[in-house]
């Protein structure tokens, strides 16, 4: 869903902090250091006063799991009720060539721009936009569900006759982003699921 990172982000952050607290509590028993003097950095338990590595997380996990005296699974879980919402904004620019006698529209160029907050995974965000643009090109140029007027039964109810657009129908798909971090989000994110598919077809039309 579009809001998954926005909604789940709060639970992920909250649960991560709980897990960190449990890890440091366990590390305090092993290292005889005060919890408030330790932190986690680069996969290690470090002393905050001088940055000294006290032990690695893998060493801590091995000790917790295989300690014969008191084996322990260090886990955390929590529940978070989301009470906010964030709105994404985007637009599409399309250049088309129209052959009026042949009633044919050819898409020459298209660009999709989105303000979806901070990009957690830029490569995946670009791929998501490309997928939405492909859907929009199909909506605008080739997809139409046809029905038999007498029976009401669909005439092109398979992927051979229902003409989805493919990469052979596309020009270069350009995706750009405006990263305005969302203050109500755990990681500054907004939505980027459905929005890329919304404005493409109207732009082509």
Segments and roles (model prediction):
Residues 1-205:
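C-terminal catalytic domains of large/alpha subunits in multi-subunit enzymes
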């Amino acid at each position: 869903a579009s809001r998954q990172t926005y909604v789940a982000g709060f639970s992920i952050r909250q649960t991560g902090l709980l897990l960190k607290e449990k890890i440091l509590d366990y590390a305090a028993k092993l290292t005889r250091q005060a919890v408030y003097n330790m932190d986690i950095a680069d996969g290690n338990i470090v002393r905050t006063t001088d940055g000294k590595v006290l032990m690695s997380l893998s060493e801590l996990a091995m000790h917790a799991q295989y300690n014969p005296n008191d084996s322990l699974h260090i886990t955390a879980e929590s529940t978070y009720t989301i009470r906010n919402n964030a709105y994404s904004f985007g637009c599409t620019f399309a250049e088309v060539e129209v052959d009026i006698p042949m009633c044919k529209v050819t898409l020459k160029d298209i660009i999709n721009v989105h303000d979806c907050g901070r990009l957690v995974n830029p490569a995946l965000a670009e791929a998501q936009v490309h997928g939405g643009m492909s859907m929009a090109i199909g909506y605008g140029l080739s997809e139409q569900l046809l029905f038999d007027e007498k029976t009401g039964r669909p005439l092109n109810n398979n992927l051979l006759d229902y003409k989805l657009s493919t990469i052979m129908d596309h020009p270069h798909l350009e995706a750009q982003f405006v990263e305005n971090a969302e203050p109500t989000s755990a990681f500054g994110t907004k939505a980027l699921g459905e929005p890329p598919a919304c404005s493409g077809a109207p732009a082509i039309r």
